[in-house]
């Protein structure tokens, strides 16, 4: 719906998209260069985070696993550069790049309705790749159009403290886990 609204607000006449290709071509016509997915976890604890405990609102093991993966994002055709630590995948749809650094240790500026401007972490989420791939016009390494797409996740404040503690210890996870109620 957002793409249809932008097209209407921009005065771009178009037929109702009926296929993936139609949606991709409309996005190209509208001139969308980036899709930013932002999430903010606002759950908080009644008690301060104890030392050497990784606190999160969902699976600690799952979050740590995702967070230690290389940062990954959909990479648009308008991007004329590549980060010095950026790499392309050898196989797959070619819609993404990854950075040679953990996603949970890669900050990106973000915005969410409730808190406003914030930092998020460039944690790998399949949506950032599948959305970039979905809106691609053309195929392979040199399509005609693809938007950049990334996911910026700001976990609960105690999880942020847990990440700082873990990365401060060279990526060694805390001895104990705690999931907030």
Regions inferred by a protein language model and the residue ranges of each:
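Rossmann-fold NAD(P)-binding glycine/threonine-rich loop
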Residues: 1-2
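C-terminal catalytic/substrate-binding lobe primarily of soluble NAD(P)-dependent oxidoreductases
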Residues: 7-181
